[in-house]
C-alpha cells in the first residue's frame, strides 16, 4: 500500500471514494421516486462516503486505525441504507386562494400536454414537509406523537404570539422532475428553518431516526413525474419550463401556519385526499379558534381509536387474570362464601 503524500490521498483510496460515491448516487437515484417530493431530495452525499473537507495531516496512521475508520464508514453507510422514511411532519395548505391558483396552473399545463395529468398532485394533498422520519411500529408512532406534542411550546415561544405567514410566489423544479410552488424570500423563511431544526432535534432526542435538516428547502409540490412511470416510457423525461412560463412570478397567496400534522406516507389517504394523520398540534388560533371540519374528523377518529384500544387492553387483562391458576378458584370460593352469608342473614 503506497503512503499518501502530504495533504492528499493515494490512488487506491481515490478509487474507493469514487466507487462509494457512485454507489451512493445510484442508491439516491433509486430512492428519489419515493422521496422526491420531500425537502431532502438534494442532500449532499459526501457524509455517506466519509468524505470531508479537512486535509489528512496524520501521515503515519496505523493500519488498525484505518480498519476502525473503514468499519465506522460501513456502519454509517449501512444505517443510511436501512433508513427508509415512512412518516413526516406536514404543514397542510388550507388557503383556498392558493389551492385555486395551483389548480389553474395544473390545468394550464395539462392543456399543453394531456399526458401530464397523471403527474399532478391532488389538491387535498398540498402541504409543506417539515421533517421526514422512520417509525417502524406502534410504539415508535406513539413516541413520535409525544415528540410532536413537546414541539408545540417551542414553536409558540419562537413565534411569541405572532402568526407565521408563508407567502408563495413563483415556480421551481428539482432536476426538472418535480414541480413546486416556491416560498417567497423573507424573514418567515428563517423562522420556518428554525422550526424545522427544532423539530429535528426534538425527534432525535426521542431516539427517532430522522432525515437531514441542513438541506431543508420548504416548497409546495404540485406535480412530479415519478407519479406515473408510464410517462418516462412514453418519452416524457423532464418538465418543460415553457409549460409554466406564465406562472414563473405568479403570486399564489399566503398560508398562515396554524397546524402541524404527523402523517404516514404509506397508509391509506383520507377521503379528502390528505394523508393519514396520527396526531396534530395547533399553533395559535384560526378563525377565532374554531377547528375546521378536517381537524374535527381527525380528533374524533383519534378519540374512537383510543377508546377501542383501552377496551381491548382491559379485556385482555381480565382474560389473563381469569386464566391464572388458583385465582379463578379463589374468586369462586369468595363468591360462594358471600352467597352463604347472604342466605344465613336471610334466615335470621
Curated annotation (Swiss-Prot):
List every stretch annotated Disordered: 1-25, 316-348
Q: Where is this region: RII-binding?
A: 296-309
What residues does CMP bind to? Answer: 129, 219-221
Q: Which residues bind AMP?
A: 129, 219-221
Q: Which domain of life is it from?
A: Eukaryota
Where in the body, by tissue, does this protein show up? Answer: Expressed in brain, heart, lung, pancreas and placenta.
GO process annotations (BP) = modulation of chemical synaptic transmission
Identify this protein by name: A-kinase anchor protein 7 isoform gamma
Q: Which organism is it from?
A: Homo sapiens
What gene does this protein come from? AKAP7
Amino acid at each position: 500500500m503506497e503512503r499518501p503524500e502530504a495533504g492528499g490521498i493515494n490512488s487506491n483510496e481515490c478509487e474507493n471514494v469514487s466507487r462509494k460515491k457512485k454507489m451512493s448516487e445510484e442508491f439516491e437515484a433509486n430512492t428519489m421516486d419515493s422521496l422526491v417530493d420531500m425537502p431532502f431530495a438534494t442532500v449532499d452525499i459526501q457524509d455517506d462516503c466519509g468524505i470531508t473537507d479537512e486535509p489528512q495531516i496524520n501521515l503515519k496512521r496505523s493500519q488498525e486505525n484505518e480498519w476502525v475508520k473503514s468499519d465506522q464508514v460501513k456502519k454509517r453507510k449501512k444505517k443510511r441504507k436501512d433508513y427508509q422514511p415512512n412518516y413526516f411532519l406536514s404543514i397542510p395548505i388550507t388557503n383556498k386562494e392558493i389551492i385555486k391558483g395551483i389548480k389553474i396552473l395544473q390545468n394550464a399545463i395539462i392543456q399543453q400536454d394531456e399526458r401530464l395529468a397523471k403527474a399532478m398532485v391532488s389538491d387535498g394533498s398540498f402541504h409543506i414537509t417539515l421533517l421526514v422520519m422512520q417509525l417502524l411500529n406502534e410504539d415508535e408512532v406513539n413516541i413520535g406523537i409525544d415528540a410532536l406534542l413537546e414541539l408545540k411550546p417551542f414553536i409558540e415561544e419562537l413565534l411569541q404570539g405572532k402568526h407565521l405567514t408563508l407567502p408563495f410566489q413563483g415556480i421551481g423544479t428539482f432536476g426538472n422532475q418535480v414541480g413546486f410552488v416556491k416560498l417567497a424570500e423573507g424573514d418567515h423563511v428563517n423562522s420556518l428553518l428554525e422550526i424545522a431544526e427544532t423539530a429535528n432535534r426534538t425527534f432525535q432526542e426521542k431516539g427517532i431516526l430522522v432525515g437531514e435538516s441542513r438541506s431543508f428547502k420548504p416548497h409546495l409540490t404540485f406535480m412530479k413525474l415519478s407519479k406515473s412511470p408510464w410517462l418516462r416510457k412514453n418519452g416524457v423525461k423532464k418538465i418543460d419550463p415553457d409549460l409554466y412560463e406564465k406562472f414563473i412570478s405568479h403570486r399564489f397567496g399566503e398560508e398562515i401556519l396554524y397546524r402541524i400534522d404527523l402523517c404516514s406516507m404509506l397508509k391509506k389517504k383520507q377521503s379528502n385526499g390528505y394523508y393519514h394523520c396520527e396526531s396534530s398540534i395547533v399553533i395559535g388560533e384560526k378563525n377565532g379558534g374554531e377547528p375546521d371540519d378536517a381537524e374535527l374528523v381527525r380528533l374524533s377518529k383519534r378519540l374512537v381509536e383510543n377508546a377501542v384500544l383501552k377496551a381491548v387492553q382491559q379485556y385482555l387483562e381480565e382474560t389473563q387474570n381469569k386464566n391464572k391458576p388458583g385465582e379463578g378458584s379463589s374468586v369462586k370460593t369468595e363468591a360462594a362464601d358471600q352467597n352463604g352469608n347472604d342466605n344465613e342473614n336471610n334466615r335470621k
